[in-house]
């Protein structure tokens, strides 16, 4: 039954990608957050940590990218199109929030917005004055170098009744569509449910040290990634634990040939 539910989720995500087709080049508009405090209150629930990802190059994205939280942590390369103000490379941003505006696909941090400017003194500030600019963007793999996937235990967690976690530094170009948990050495797996944003939770918390398995959209199907390190028996809320593994897969979308390419 659990495998069937995973299959349904994977099919749903791929059917959504037919419309969004992340790997293709998208043309739209982008604005930026005028308040720095907004960066720490995003729908993905990364909190103040959000500004530490990719040197603060983060973004809120429209629902087709946010995907009810499955798009949290996804990376996109974005560049503005004004040749007088914008460089050709743009910048890479990580999705940390939901953008509900119908005016732009992306709302960037001001740091990311300025990074799209030509490297000429004062041009970045002039670009900010534009407020909203035409952009191109496409999804790219997230690269954290030698850093592993991390599991953060949320403050609401309390033994033995509730465990909430979120994944940090998720690499590759894919989505996590399921998380299972079990005592170390046991085959009695129980599933966690997405609570909100990047947060997964369960009210059936096994005792002792815990192991995870993550189901991701790898290739054209789901793939299981097993944690090589465990959540210790004395886990604490607010702590971050190394999963001992990194996700490097790139999901293969079932969409048609892209109409535009990045060049």
Swiss-Prot record:
InterPro entries associated with the record: Expan_Lol_pI, Expansin/allergen_DPBB_dom, Expansin_CBD, Expansin_CBD_sf, RlpA-like_DPBB, RlpA-like_sf
Record keywords, A-Z: Glycoprotein, Secreted, Signal
Location(s) in or outside the cell: Secreted
Extent of the signal sequence: 1-20
GO terms (BP aspect): anatomical structure morphogenesis; plant-type cell wall loosening
Alphabetized CDD domains for the sequence: DPBB_EXLA_N (cd22276)
Domain Expansin-like EG45: 41-147
Residues of the Expansin-like CBD domain: 161-243
A cellular component annotation (GO) from this entry: extracellular region
One family name in Pfam for this protein: DPBB_1
Main location: secreted
Glycosylated residues, chain numbering: 99, 102
PROSITE patterns linked: EXPANSIN_CBD, EXPANSIN_EG45
Gene3D superfamilies: Expansin, cellulose-binding-like domain, RlpA-like domain
Protein family: Belongs to the expansin family. Expansin-like A subfamily.
Family matches, as PANTHER family: EXPANSIN-B3, EXPANSIN-LIKE A1-RELATED
Protein name: Expansin-like A3
């Amino acid at each position: 039954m659990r495998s069937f539910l995973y299959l349904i989720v994977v099919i749903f995500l791929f059917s959504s990608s037919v419309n969004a087709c992340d790997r293709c080049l998208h043309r739209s508009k982008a604005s930026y957050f005028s308040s720095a405090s907004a960066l720490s209150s995003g729908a993905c629930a990364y909190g103040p940590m959000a500004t530490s990802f990719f040197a603060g190059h983060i973004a809120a994205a429209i629902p087709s990218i946010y995907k009810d939280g499955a798009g949290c942590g996804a990376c996109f390369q974005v560049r503005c199109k004004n040749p007088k103000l914008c460089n050709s490379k743009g910048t890479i941003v990580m999705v940390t929030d939901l953008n509900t505006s119908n005016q732009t696909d992306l709302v960037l941090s001001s740091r990311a917005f300025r990074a799209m400017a030509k490297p000429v003194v004062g041009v970045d500030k002039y670009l900010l004055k534009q407020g909203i600019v035409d952009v191109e963007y496409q999804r790219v793999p997230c690269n954290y170098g030698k850093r592993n996937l991390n599991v953060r235990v949320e403050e609401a967690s309390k033994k033995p009744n509730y465990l909430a976690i979120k994944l940090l530094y998720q690499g590759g170009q894919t989505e996590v569509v399921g998380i299972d948990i079990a005592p170390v050495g046991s085959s009695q797996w129980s599933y966690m449910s997405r609570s909100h944003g990047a947060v997964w939770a369960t009210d059936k918390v096994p005792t002792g040290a815990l192991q995870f398995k993550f189901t991701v959209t790898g290739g054209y199907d789901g793939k299981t990634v097993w944690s090589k390190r465990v959540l210790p028996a004395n886990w604490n809320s607010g702590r971050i634990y190394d999963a001992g593994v990194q996700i490097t897969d790139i999901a293969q979308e079932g969409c048609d040939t892209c109409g535009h390419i990045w060049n």
